[in-house]
């Protein structure tokens, strides 16, 4: 259910874009993201930091898009979010000396420190590359191409990278000696 809720604003954005335009889609995105945040609070009495950060960025960049009637702001939101994710991952590894991915998954998975570091760095690079791809597609290709890339391309890339990360983790998990 939670994964569905995470994708709901994206689905709403896409539907409103196809039915109306980028400004209706942006308005719908802001409203849907707020509804998901409120639902999460009411249902679970908890709002994850990433969900809150995402909402703030959606509200700010979406609000600027609507106020100035300029879609460049909502296009930048994607890259800013990816830059923040990459920055948090790199900061955790290089400054805090403990990869963020390890902080998030370390209780569930026993992996060597080098694996955590590589995985953390790989995700940081992934987010940087996605952010750069977004800049290129958002500002050099037609708007409809960007919307499709944002909804389908980035979602597919993230799913594939998650799968590859899972394979990488599986290959480095301690083996049970009883088999």
From Swiss-Prot:
> Which classification does the entry list for the species?
Bacteria, Pseudomonadati, Pseudomonadota, Gammaproteobacteria, Enterobacterales
Name the membrane topology term.
Answer: Multi-pass membrane protein
Disulfide-bonded cysteine pairs: these are none
Q: Where are the transmembrane segments?
A: 22-42, 50-70, 76-96, 121-141, 149-169
Q: NCBIfam families of this UniProt entry?
A: ispZ, PRK00259.1-2, PRK00259.1-3, PRK00259.1-4
Q: Give the record's keywords alphabetically.
A: Cell inner membrane, Cell membrane, Membrane, Transmembrane, Transmembrane helix
UniProt xrefs under PANTHER family: INNER MEMBRANE-SPANNING PROTEIN YCIB (PTHR36917:SF1), INTRACELLULAR SEPTATION PROTEIN A-RELATED (PTHR36917)
GO cellular component terms listed in the entry, alphabetical order: plasma membrane
| InterPro entries assigned | YciB
Which segments of the protein form a coiled coil according to its record? none
Its biological purpose is as follows: Plays a role in cell envelope biogenesis, maintenance of cell envelope integrity and membrane homeostasis.
Q: Where in the cell is it found?
A: Cell inner membrane
The species this protein was found in: Klebsiella pneumoniae (strain 342)
What is this protein called in UniProt? Answer: Inner membrane-spanning protein YciB
The UniProt entry's sequence similarity note says: Belongs to the YciB family.
Report the Pfam families cross-referenced here: IspA
């Amino acid at each position: 259910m939670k994964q569905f809720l995470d994708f709901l604003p994206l689905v709403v954005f896409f539907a409103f874009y196809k039915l109306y335009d980028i400004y209706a889609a942006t308005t719908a995105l802001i409203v849907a993201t707020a509804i998901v945040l409120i639902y999460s609070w009411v249902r679970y009495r908890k709002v994850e930091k990433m969900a809150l950060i995402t909402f703030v960025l959606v509200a700010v960049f979406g609000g600027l898009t609507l106020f100035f009637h300029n879609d460049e702001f909502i296009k930048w939101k994607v890259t800013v979010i990816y830059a923040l994710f990459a920055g948090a991952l790199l900061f955790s590894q290089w400054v805090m000396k403990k990869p963020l991915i390890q902080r998030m998954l370390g209780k569930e998975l026993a992996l060597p420190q080098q694996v955590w570091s590589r995985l953390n760095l790989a995700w940081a690079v992934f987010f940087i590359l996605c952010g750069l791809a977004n800049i290129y597609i958002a500002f050099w290709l037609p708007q409809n191409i960007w919307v499709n890339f944002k909804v389908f391309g980035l979602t597919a890339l993230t799913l594939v990278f998650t799968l590859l990360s899972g394979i990488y983790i599986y290959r480095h998990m301690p083996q049970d000696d009883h088999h």
